[in-house]
A protein has these predicted regions:
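Metallocarboxypeptidase
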Residues: 80, 85-282
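Residue-level detector of functionally pivotal "anchor" positions at catalytic/ligand-binding pockets or at interdomain
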Residues: 268-280, 372-383, 415-416, 533-555, ...
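Intrinsically disordered, low-complexity Pro/Gly/Ser/Thr-rich segments with frequent PxxP/GP/PP motifs
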Residues: 313-342
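Terminal connector regions
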Residues: 337-372
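Extracellular glycan-recognition surfaces and repeat-rich motifs
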Residues: 375-419, 468-494
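Extracellular beta-strand-rich recognition modules
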Residues: 380, 429-444, 452, 456, ...
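Extracellular carbohydrate recognition
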Residues: 449-451, 516-535
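C-terminal outer-membrane/trafficking sorting elements
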Residues: 545-555, 559-632
Length: 632
């Protein structure tokens, strides 16, 4: 038979360094050449960008990356011989069997649970899934075995086609491994880039014994177990031999997942933060969660803040995670302080950075100083504030009863959907210095292909600008490439916030829009408890100064059954309006009083215990805004 070739990409490929090793293979099955093609594409991408891309440079300098582009050269060449223009359907190698048939399925010839039953492989030589006369009977798989035991990989990717899935053990039984959470977490992250489904091979496709993934994970004697995956590239229409115009697209789909796979095999952590956009104290914190995904043990990760605004006077010390456990979420925070000269509505920017000895990743956080007040709230119990011929209320899924608003109130969204919902009201931000759109959301769409966007328009809907929130992500869909979208699956309500400060000084409308393709239809997007909060330009004092210039004395605070409000200074307004909101901007109580009254009494008996905000308006001007605690 023909030789198998392997390639090593590293900063010193001729040396065996004490670095993490990852293996990519392809073409176990001769009619699945897209696996080899994407591998060659990725190898060229690494080499061509080594000198110009610091991330790729560091990746290659700190990892030994191995490639075996063609595990089955005899079968591949046979297809080339009989179908030189592509399309050959030979699957196995070219062993001559005792019954004069040809071929062994190389992905049924590995030693772990070889021949476990006749469902996951076949004892019949003429079968497409013939496992061979014995485990490791085939020279190709013997070479793979010896190669793997020589280099001791901790992560392996065996590329196949097709079904747009990412498979992992077990294949030989319909069960999961003891370390299924690791496989599942890795697969979830890896498929963010290409929208593939994922799961154990036996549950996603069919039983398969004597396969590569099971052996790498559990069958290597005197070796560390390797987390092994099988990406199945392409959909049913693209098949084993995708058309020429599809090849580059399929190769590009795998690049980011391959990068992440290399990081998983080495050192890799992530930080997430969902801090509220508004803050009101001169001393504050940036809170975050850290999780380690990289398989390398004994690594220290550092999280730090760097001020990017002159209004930030200081930041706290970095936080170190020394030898964190794999996939355990750690919560922490770092303090920062702002100048006493900061004014309500002022924005600050802080760089949040995660680094280890190899890699650095940073995100810029934008925060707004001050206590906002809502100019619009909607509990989404009716469609009164919205215009749409498709979206509507749903009384089964909601953040707060009795309902939410969704793109498909009954069932899943349709194929080729292009639906939207627009606010009937035009929101006036002409006097706002800062503004934030807040809502609760959950969603379930086909990743990459179907998505939801939130838009703003300042010209009555003639033109729309896509808005970026804390939970949106850049799209990889060519229709809206790199635009912020909500895609994939998030089945827990999250409090989304979108900074609308770029639109202050104008009036705007808000729109939610969903688009889908012709294939998979899912439940869609829900939103609930939406509000638009602003800090007014006329608010000329900071929250800390406000306490020294109060126009009204509010007592008691915390309050029980009643709240009393007494003017501290005379004013000329004819009437006073008292409004009480919860922390999400929902209006719970509004009451008006003549300005001549010496004490205003507000009944709180019907308000549940909790944290609220009280707004006092004298005439048309908001003169006081305070936090209120109600405790029955």
């Amino acid at each position: 038979g023909r030789q198998l070739f392997w390639v090593k990409i590293s900063d010193h490929p001729e040396m065996d360094e004490s670095e993490n090793r990852i293996l990519f293979t392809a073409l176990h099955h001769a009619r699945e050449p897209i696996g080899m093609q994407q591998m060659l594409f990725f190898m060229y991408y690494l080499l061509e960008n080594y000198d110009s891309n610091p991330y790729i440079h560091q990746l290659i300098d700190t990892t030994e990356i191995f490639f075996i582009p063609c595990v089955n050269p005899d079968g591949y060449e046979f297809n080339h011989l009989v179908s030189p223009n592509g399309g050959g359907m030979w699957r196995k190698n070219r062993r001559l069997n005792p019954d004069n048939s040809y071929g062994v399925d190389l992905n049924r010839n590995y030693g772990y649970m070889w021949g476990y039953d006749d469902l996951g492989s076949s004892p019949v030589p003429s079968s497409e899934t013939y496992r061979g006369p014995s485990a490791f009977s085939e020279p190709e798989i013997q070479m793979i075995r010896d190669f793997a035991q020589l280099y001791d990989f901790n992560l392996v990717f065996n590329y196949h086609a097709y079904s747009n899935t990412l498979l992992y053990p077990w294949g030989y039984i319909t069960d999961t491994t003891a370390e299924n959470p690791i496989f599942k977490n890795f697969a979830f992250k890896l498929t963010n880039y290409n929208a593939n489904a994922y799961g154990p091979a036996s549950l996603m496709l069919y039983l398969v014994n004597g396969n590569s993934d099971d052996w790498y994970y559990a069958g290597q004697v005197n070796q560390q177990r390797a987390f092994s995956f099988t990406p199945e590239i392409g959909n049913n229409m693209q098949g084993f031999w995708p058309s020429i115009d599809q090849i580059i697209l399929l190769c590009q789909d795998q690049v980011e997942a391959n990068f992440l796979a290399i990081r998983f095999g080495s050192r890799y952590g992530e930080i997430t933060q969902h801090n509220k956009l508004f803050f009101s104290q001169n001393q504050n914190f940036v809170s975050f969660h850290f999780k380690r995904y990289g398989l390398e043990e004994g690594v220290t990760y550092k999280v730090s803040l760097l001020p990017l605004s002159n209004l930030i006077e200081s930041v706290g010390q970095p936080v170190y995670f020394n030898h964190p456990e794999l996939l355990i979420s750690y919560s922490d925070s770092i303090s920062f302080s702002v100048s006493k000269d900061i004014l309500p509505g002022d924005e600050i920017k802080i760089l949040l950075t995660l680094e280890d000895d190899y890699f650095t990743h940073s995100d810029t956080l934008t925060l707004i100083f001050g206590i906002p007040y809502p100019i619009f709230t909607d509990e989404c119990t009716t469609m009164g504030n919205w215009s749409s011929n498709k979206w509507g209320n749903n009384s089964f899924v909601y953040n707060s009863p009795p309902s939410s608003i969704t793109d498909s109130p009954v069932g899943n969204y349709s194929s080729n959907a292009n639906t939207s919902i627009t606010s009937t009201q035009e929101f006036d931000l002409t006097k706002a210095k800062a503004a934030v759109l807040s809502f609760y959301a959950l969603w379930d769409t086909e990743r990459r292909y179907d998505f939801v966007q939130v838009f703003a328009s300042i010209d009555q809907g003639q033109h729309w600008t896509a808005l970026q929130g804390k939970y949106s992500s850049p799209s990889s869909n060519p229709l809206v490439m790199d635009q912020p979208v909500y895609q994939g699956t998030n089945l827990q309500w999250v409090n989304e916030e979108i900074n609308l400060s770029p639109f202050t000084g104008q009036k705007l409308k808000i729109k939610f829009a969903l688009k889908s393709n012709q294939f998979i239809n899912k439940d869609g997007f829900y939103f609930d408890d939406i509000s638009l909060q602003i800090i007014d330009k006329s608010t000329g004092i900071t929250p800390s100064e406000q306490n020294n210039q109060l126009l009204y004395t509010i007592f008691p605070n915390p309050a029980n059954g009643a709240l009393h409000i007494r003017p501290a200074n005379p004013h000329t307004a004819q009437s006073v309006q008292v409004s009480i909101y919860n922390i999400f901007g929902k209006l719970f109580l509004r009451q008006s009083f003549p300005s001549s009254i010496r004490r205003m009494d507000v009944n709180l008996e019907n308000l549940p215990s909790g944290v609220y905000f009280i707004s006092i308006e004298a005439g048309v001007e908001q003169v006081q805004w305070e936090k209120l605690l109600i405790s029955h």
